[in-house]
UniProtKB/Swiss-Prot annotation:
Name by which UniProt lists this protein: Protein maternal effect lethal 26
PROSITE patterns in UniProt: BTB, MATH
Expressing tissues: Expressed in body wall muscles.
Pfam annotation, one family: MATH_2
Domain of life: Eukaryota
Known role: Probable substrate-specific adapter of an E3 ubiquitin-protein ligase complex which mediates the ubiquitination and subsequent proteasomal degradation of target proteins. Controls degradation of microtubule severing protein mei-1 after meiosis. Controls degradation of ppfr-1, the regulatory subunit of PP4 complex, after meiosis. In body wall muscles, involved in the organization of myosin thick filaments, likely by regulating the degradation of mei-1 downstream of unc-89. May also activate the TORC1 pathway.
Oligomeric and partner information: Interacts (via BTB domain) with cul-3. Seems to be a component of a E3 ubiquitin-protein ligase complex containing cul-3. Interacts (probably via MATH domain) with mei-1, which targets mei-1 for ubiquitin-mediated proteolysis. Interacts (probably via MATH domain) with ppfr-1, the regulatory subunit of the PP4 complex; targets ppfr-1 for ubiquitin-mediated proteolysis. May interact (via MATH domain) with unc-89 (via Ig-like C2-type domain 2/3 and, Ig-like C2-type domain 50 and fibronectin type-III domain 2).
Origin organism lineage: Eukaryota, Metazoa, Ecdysozoa, Nematoda, Chromadorea
Compartments (UniProt record): Cytoplasm, Myofibril, Sarcomere, M line; Cytoplasm, Myofibril, Sarcomere, I band
Amino acid sequence: MEPRIDGGVFIGGIGNSGNEMCSNGVPALGVSSQTEIKVEKVQHTWTVKNFSHCYQEYLENFVYLQRGDEQLTWSIKIYPKGNGENNKDFVFLCLNRVINNNVKAGKIGFKSQFKLRTAENKDIEMRIHPNPSHSDYVSYIKRDVLFPQIMPRDMIIVNVEIDVAVETITTTNEPIQFEPTNSEQQLIEDYQRLFSQELLCDFAINVNGKIIRAHKAVLAARSPVFNAMLTHQDTDEAKSSMMYINDMDYDVIYEMVYYIYCGRCNKDITDMATALLIAADKYRLEELKSHCEKYLVENINIENACSLLIIGDLYSAPKLRKRAVTYILARPKNVTGTPGWEDILKGHPNLITDIFSQIDRQSSTGATSSVSNLPGVPMDIPGITGNIVPPPSGL
């Protein structure tokens, strides 16, 4: 049961929040604001000795916070036997804001708490009154609970902590215009400079006697093949910080390493797209390989269709392979007269089978090409003795 607190006048209160809105209730576009409630902390320790011999109605002490010319004051009162006949079995600790008559009264928001301790600095548990009628803050404890804890030294230590909301400040921030930046482009330029100026290089690639200097970390980060080569300390390349390439042209490897650094090609790849695709496949540079494959697909012609079909098959470039087959089927008489067709006949007969399979698929779907799409119609294919009859669809 809560003890009753008799009489008195409530003093103090909570200050305004200081929130501000635009006249239409919506912040202006591009403008932001910030509200800060400044809080100052007040701490005070009050020691009372021979507490059991306190016979007056209450003990009083004061806590101060100086702010410029203004001094904020709080009264701390200890009621050894309550403040009335109805609660004489309780000890009260009360806190009140004291209004100075010489200072303009204003609402100051604050939060407070009491901590009661013994002479041995052990906490004494108190209860907080939920709705005091005569004070801003009240804690209480029964006398028969308190006194056994403070004996035999008969001393209490009262710690009061007050958090005071002294000021509310709202600031408005005008938008600041920054020049747009292109961090991706800047990154490319930085890595291009790192490569072209050979800054802090720790690795060399010897291509037929010509040196390309690079950085192990960059190569390992971009290529799984380089990663495996350079992170295993027992490889020759990791030990010597040098690798040798004798089966590819210097220009192709230089372009490949440039792409590793910059994510784009340094120059026109017309004369090296096929070789660059092969290099990208070897070092598992999927982006570069896809870039080369796209270029070759867009530049397929009668003279290179067969060789690109072989490249697409050997180096797992499915889009290039498919485009080459489609191109050959659309121009069989022209394509089969090229040296590339001879290469297919001699070294890659499996591709002939794939071409006929494509004819069969076109027949079953009703698609048309320059090659007869009717099953059982003989076709004269250069390099193959006799007439080749594609199998009927559905078998």
